[in-house]
Regions:
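Single-stranded nucleic acid-binding surfaces, predominantly the OB-fold ssDNA-binding core
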Residues: 1-109
Length: 109
């Protein structure tokens, strides 16, 4: 049996899509959710900034053309990890979302 590696995230673009090597693109988005605050009662706002990579060249081109800052989107994809050397013999592990499907929400006038 294979492990499930799938994510669905909705949010707002905070850094416009930019081209990278090999006809790919990267963009940053912010997903906001509200959760109950057991200490103070009520709810609190939780913001989650994410870095999203698009590896499919045709989807990457569409993202570069259609993702200005402030646009709402829905991303379906998978998590991918990478180990980064920080210095002093330490490594830092980062996760990014690799988009397989991007839905552009309508721009409100």
């Amino acid at each position: 049996m294979n492990d499930l590696n799938s994510v669905l995230i909705e949010g707002t673009i905070i850094e416009a899509a930019r081209a990278t090597a090999d006809n790919r693109c990267m963009f940053s988005m912010l997903s906001v959710r509200y959760e109950s605050d057991s200490v103070n009662g009520g709810t609190k706002k939780v913001e989650l900034p994410l870095e999203v990579e698009v590896k499919l060249w045709r989807l990457a081109k569409a993202c570069i053309e259609n993702l200005p800052v402030g646009r709402r989107i829905r991303v379906v994809g998978r998590l991918e990890g990478e180990a980064l050397a920080v210095g002093g013999g330490f490594e830092r592990y980062c996760l990014r979302v690799v988009a397989e499907h991007v839905e552009f929400k309508p721009i409100k006038a």
